[in-house]
Amino acid sequence: FIPGTLEKWGIGPDVLMAKNGGLVIVRVSGWGQTGPYAHKPGFGSLIEGMSGFAAMTGFADREPLLPPLALADMIAGLAGYGAVLAALRARDQGFGQGQVVDLSLFEPLFSILGPMATAHAIDGSVPKRSGNWGDVAAPRNVYECSDGGYVAMSATMQSMWEKLAVAIERPELVEDPRFLTNPDRVQNRSELETIVSEFFAKRTVQENLTYFEERGITVGPICNIADLIKHPFILGRQVVKTYADPDHGALPMHAPFPKLSGTPGTVRTPAPMQGENTDEVLAEIGLTADQIATLRDKGIV
């Protein structure tokens, strides 16, 4: 909510914590509870644009790109999760009370984009859109294969680059002044990527995966969900599990992660239908069956 909304409803942190001083209250908004934008609404797309993410995503000759998912919201959720654990730990280890977590969508996303502010202060650099190449290491790209599929490869470490040069049957490139060091390869990455791309284009996805894996090169497939649902990694690690659903039968869903050795998570039930647990919740807070029935008769619940 925009800052001030809870206060307008009469349930601001001061009111809630007067009832229970141990509460940890996470306030998530686009721009945070303070600052010149605090009063503004802020959806994830705005944050993805203003944070620097879109400016550095995409190709140099095209418009900035927004992510095809709620990236800012999801990263803020992970940050909030960590903040709640820290606040609970502080409460239980001597601080003795709850606190309010002021979480904007902006700061978590801005933080994972790297030390842009520091780099800009030192040398004035501004990250540019460079597609899959990146600005600091080469070769790194997505490569089309002979069957129309794609693989991703990163051979940016010097030892990996030297293995790659041998694997693509161009060992002389290791001593080529254009590609001698990583800065050299970044400077001349257009020529380098052309050479590497031509080699990948001669083989299918599976042929490339097998060929480079045998030679210790880090290559992986570009997968969509149809590929993933039957992928041996997904199956072997149980990334997705099947759960019973009253409407759809057996449904594949993300399994809980991270995987704790002593107390692994589990999905007890599928998501409830709207209002499915209303009576149960109202009973937990002390309402009788007659009172709940009255609320239903009046259309309140």
PLM regions: where:
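Beta-strand segments within the central parallel beta-sheet cores of soluble alpha/beta enzyme folds
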Residues: 98-106, 211, 293-297
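Aromatic-enriched alpha-helical interface/lid elements that frame and gate functional surfaces
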Residues: 134, 139-215, 219
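A glycine-rich dinucleotide-binding beta-alpha-beta segment and adjacent secondary-structure elements
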Residues: 214-268
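Short linear loop/turn motifs
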Residues: 175-185, 223-230, 291-301
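Alpha-helical scaffold segments in soluble metabolic enzymes
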Residues: 80-87, 163-167, 195, 227, ...
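Flexible, small-/acidic-enriched active-site or ligand-binding loops
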Residues: 180, 244, 248-294
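Active-site-adjacent "lid/gating" segments in soluble enzymes
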Residues: 5-156
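Residue-level signal for nonpolar/aromatic packing positions in well-ordered secondary structure
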Residues: 16, 25, 44, 84, ...
